[in-house]
A protein has these predicted regions:
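Non-heme Fe(II) oxygenase catalytic core, chiefly the N-lobe of the double-stranded beta-helix
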Residues: 3, 12-228
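Short, low-complexity, intrinsically disordered N-terminal peptides in bacterial proteins
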Residues: 1-7
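Catalytic core of Fe(II)/2-oxoglutarate
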Residues: 215-284
Length: 284
């Protein structure tokens, strides 16, 4: 079982805040091995095996307690982060402008000595597949497992550097941002407080691609999970999600997250457009 518990501290359990009720897709049980089959981007939607079921949960507004959140306790935070990017659909501008911005953000928030930005995913809630982008993920999950976390380091770094880095602390953090000039109204992202996740609450899910197989954690339903979100995120905000931490000293090692339908959204909400950037943060 993964070791995910955070240390109990005076600020480890934030007070509960106003909430909405929404359905999120969990694994109901482990009667069927979870597997997700991913076609190339723009060619179709993923197909998944597993006994998934929608469960209604209370998702609390995290804005009133944003300053109390920590990557080492809850495993997600909200950061104020203005960007100079004009067009997030321009891959050259992403590489030239946004990657250095994200690298600086991760260093600022974690104190990491080196940050590697290695992947971007644009998600569009309105006809995302037709436009060659992915739709928001409606599944309670975490992007890495105990196995795939270290493997990502080996995949991305030269062999000698990878093995040296694996001997020290490293963290995998996703940076999630609204790329529209309007606040998010459709399919916001919800997060589970890491401290409310028990080891039995996650299952390994195989990710099948045309050229490789990976794995992530899928959430198994637990009524004790504490859910949060940041309503109406703007273009100058970024959510940081810790997806893997090599340290096993009591700090939070990862969280769970999923898109959901916010019942307070307008009747005809503006389609969500977002970018999720994956990073590796290394510490000396």
């Amino acid at each position: 079982m993964p070791d995910i518990r955070a240390a109990e501290t005076t600020n480890a359990r934030p007070v509960l805040t106003p909430w909405v009720e929404a359905a999120v897709p969990y694994l109901a049980d482990l009667s069927v091995k979870p597997v997700t089959y991913n076609p190339p981007v723009g060619t179709g939607t993923p197909r998944r095996d597993g006994n998934y079921r929608d469960f209604k949960v209370r998702i609390h507004d995290a804005r009133p307690i944003a300053r109390d959140l920590s990557l080492d306790h809850q495993a997600f935070i909200l950061a104020q982060h203005a960007t100079a990017v004009r067009d997030f659909y321009d891959h050259d501008e992403i590489r030239r402008t946004y990657e250095p911005e994200v690298e600086a953000l991760i260093k600022r928030e974690t104190g990491a000595s080196k940050v590697v930005v290695f992947d971007h995913t644009i998600r569009a809630a309105d006809r995302g597949v037709e436009r060659g982008h992915r739709a928001p993920v409606r599944s309670v999950h975490n992007d890495y497992t105990e196995k795939s976390g270290p493997q990502r380091v080996r995949d991305l770094l030269p062999p000698d550097e990878a093995e040296a880095r694996l001997k020290k602390r490293f963290v995998e953090i996703n940076v999630w941002r609204n790329v529209s000039h309007d606040p998010v109204e459709m399919a916001p992202l919800g997060f589970v407080d890491s401290q409310s996740i028990a080891p039995r609450d996650v299952a390994v899910c195989d990710l099948i691609y045309a050229d490789r197989t990976g794995e992530i954690y899928i959430g198994v339903y637990n009524a004790d999970h504490r859910w949060y979100y940041f309503p109406k995120m703007t273009r100058d905000e970024a959510a940081l999600i810790k997806c893997y931490d090599s340290m096993k000293d009591g700090r939070a090692r990862f969280s769970l997250h999923s898109a959901f339908d916010d019942p307070t959204s307008p009747k005809n909400p503006k389609p969500r457009e977002s970018i999720e950037t994956r990073t590796l943060a290394f510490f000396d």
